[in-house]
Amino acid sequence: MKKYLFSAITVLFVSLVLAGCSYGDGTPISSLDDSSMPIRRYDLLQMRYLTTGDYSALQKMRSTYIVETRALVESLLKIGVLGESGMNERILEYYEDSTLSAAIEDVNKTFANMDKENEQLRICLNRMQRLLPEVELPDVYTQIGDFEQSIVVCGRKVGISLEKYLGPDYPVYKRFFDEQQRKQMTREYMIPECMSIYLLSQFPFGDFQNISQAKRDFHLQCVWYVVNKLLGEEFFGRSETSKVDAFMQMHKDMSLSELLNYSRQEMSKVSGASAENAK
């Protein structure tokens, strides 16, 4: 659990860096029917541009997907500002790296069909509307990054980097990640991590440095407990939600929204006390 906890916190910090960005005139999701495909395949546009230089794909990346492209270029790849002269060529050059070129091809093969993930996310979002009505539904898309971050959040938009979910035996992973990390780099973790990081961005830690490890762990367990409810299964096992399971047994009338707000308020109390003591 500790390795996963560290990974989740690391991704959260990157998410919060992007949280203040503007996301244009995107329309919030209000409902999802059985035919909806809630995951938008931005990665397919990337592939078209990166493998063929298709100008129409580039135009769509810089219009329909302007926020996603800006987040990719400026915050994930960190290769400059999107509107800079020569940026189109710079993007192409960046992905000419042999490791990334191979990843593009492998992502294309592995994720040719994402029906299972779409269905899993659709179920989560429908449950979120009912169980967390005050939380705006995330706008989820897929992308190809550079093996640095699995999930990025920009306000309501959540980007899933598919190159981080190619399976524990993917050759590149063995060079950079330990065995425990590789076990989590499978497509089964994609939607649970997506929902976890999005909820952490909506119910953040606050003053992270002044919060005890016990409070951090409890808040993460609260998020995982809620994600289990959204998934309709115990993806995060009892060992990872044991404290919250016990807490909810004593507070059976508490809603999921109340649980997350309670945990966040408890951390605020600790942060406030720490700040006062520091004066």
Task: Describe each region flagged by the PLM.
Residues 10, 27, 51-52, 64, ...:
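Residue-identity detector for threonine
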Residues 22-92:
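N-terminal mature-domain "stem" immediately C-terminal to a signal peptide or N-terminal signal-anchor/transmembrane
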Residues 90-279:
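Acidic/His-rich structured neighborhood in mature extracellular/periplasmic domains
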Residues 1-9:
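Bacterial N-terminal signal peptides that target proteins for export
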Residues 17-20:
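C-terminal motif of bacterial Sec signal peptides marking the signal peptidase cleavage site
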